[in-house]
């Protein structure tokens, strides 16, 4: 499957699409990223990987009838990349002092902290919302 012109991002998205498909998780993608990006390609792929990995893991712990992952990613203007990943979840989201705690082990979750750090390093931002069984992460990376 081909999702976008940027080969690195396309590979990441395709990998997680294949995993979701294998697990029968509905996976929606709206992505428009050109071959050449105004933002760091490695950082963009790290953000995509972290968010999609988290979404896949949360979906696997969600009742099969409610599972879904939705990815939206595109450029805004000449220097911003906007990424949003939504997924359903069952259970309790654990957060302490603005830091999400890992659902896999004791302590902080590394993935979302990494995403926040990458966004801030590029003078961007990341936000997380969760309500009524829907978890949403929005990331803005600046070039």
Language model regions located:
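Glycine-rich nucleotide-binding loop
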Residues: 91-93, 131-138
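Conserved short strand/loop->alpha-helix "switch" segment adjacent to the catalytic nucleotide/phosphoryl-transfer site
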Residues: 5, 28-47
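Glycine-rich/acidic phosphate-handling loop/turn and adjacent ATP-lid/helix
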Residues: 78-109
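Conserved ATP-binding N-box helix of the HATPase_c
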Residues: 41-64
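Short beta-strand/loop element within the Bergerat-fold HATPase_c
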Residues: 66-79
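Glycine-rich ATP-binding loops of the HATPase_c
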Residues: 122-133
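Short beta-to-alpha transition helix within the HATPase_c
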Residues: 5-23
């Amino acid at each position: 499957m081909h999702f976008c012109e940027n080969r690195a991002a396309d590979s990441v998205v395709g990998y997680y699409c294949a995993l979701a498909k294998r697990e029968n998780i509905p996976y929606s993608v709206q992505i428009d990223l050109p071959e050449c990006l105004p933002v760091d390609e490695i950082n963009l792929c790290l953000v995509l990987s972290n968010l999609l990995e988290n979404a896949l893991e949360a979906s696997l712990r969600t009742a099969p009838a409610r599972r879904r992952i939705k990815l939206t990613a595109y450029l805004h203007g000449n220097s911003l990349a906007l990424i949003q990943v939504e997924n359903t979840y069952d259970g309790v989201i654990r957060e302490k002092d603005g830091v999400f705690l890992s659902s896999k082990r004791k302590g902080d979750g590394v993935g979302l902290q990494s995403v926040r750090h990458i966004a801030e390093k590029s003078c961007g931002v990341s936000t997380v919302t969760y309500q009524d069984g829907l978890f949403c992460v929005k990331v803005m990376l600046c070039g």
